[in-house]
């Protein structure tokens, strides 16, 4: 079982600050320099954390309403977590900011609900768009286009790809392996690299491809056999779900979409513009 992340992006932090300005004048701290009342304390909390905490509470409310998580699911996950962590279970809870199993169950429940929200975004079109064979490639990565073109000329004149990769490549993970990368499928590489790789035939070299890492020269060494769509459909769905679950930017988009569709109305004047960003 993979270790569940208990924090899904900054907007779902497990903060439990009380924001109720109850108007009490009871002091919660006294010093030689003066005292701090409960109402002053709550006012300060509201000023500093009110909007963030309100956002989190609304997201939790929407998630639990739209994506039901059963007690059985949570209990099963908790027991698996206990088995995995063993004697380190209590340390694990402390490191994740929870004091007891009930709090942990609530966090697991929220995590499950958010994962269900993410999984629901995978459509039939997404699956069909990713129905492509997995590729095996080697590449040479350099910082500038001039060097990339010079290396391509050497390759065109018959020089060995692996030898040039060991000499020039600035990718530490593949350099000593002659530029060889692990097998990959759709959505696993930066777009520019992936698009170029899927256009190649086995044995073919790409022109220099610019990405955020630099300039790549790609060699397609193998294209795996593609199984029938119906056999691969569920595997592709699961891969897409896991990619999105692990993508913080996708978390933000899902959260934004949940809030935009929640018909939120804020009556508190101090928190009125909490969801103003959703209007853009």
Swiss-Prot record:
Catalytic reactions of this protein: [protein]-peptidylproline (omega=180) = [protein]-peptidylproline (omega=0)
Biological process per Gene Ontology, one example term: protein folding
Keyword Translocase in record: no
Signal peptide: 1-21
Major location category of this protein: membrane
Membrane topology recorded in Swiss-Prot or TrEMBL: Lipid-anchor
EC number: 5.2.1.8
A GO cellular-component term linked to this record: plasma membrane
PROSITE patterns, sorted: PPIC_PPIASE_1, PPIC_PPIASE_2, PROKAR_LIPOPROTEIN
Cellular localisation: Cell membrane
A single GO molecular function term of this UniProt record: peptidyl-prolyl cis-trans isomerase activity
Lipidation (S-diacylglycerol cysteine): 22
Top-level enzyme category: isomerase
Residue numbers with lipid attached (N-palmitoyl cysteine): 22
HAMAP family assigned to the protein according to its UniProt record, in alphabetical order: Foldase_PrsA (MF_01145)
Record-linked PANTHER family: FOLDASE PROTEIN PRSA, PEPTIDYLPROLYL ISOMERASE
Function of the protein: Plays a major role in protein secretion by helping the post-translocational extracellular folding of several secreted proteins.
Similarity field: Belongs to the PrsA family.
Protein's name in the database: Foldase protein PrsA 4
Species of the source: Bacillus cereus (strain ATCC 14579 / DSM 31 / CCUG 7414 / JCM 2152 / NBRC 15305 / NCIMB 9373 / NCTC 2599 / NRRL B-3711)
Organism taxonomic ancestry: Bacteria, Bacillati, Bacillota, Bacilli, Bacillales
Gene symbol of the encoding locus: prsA4
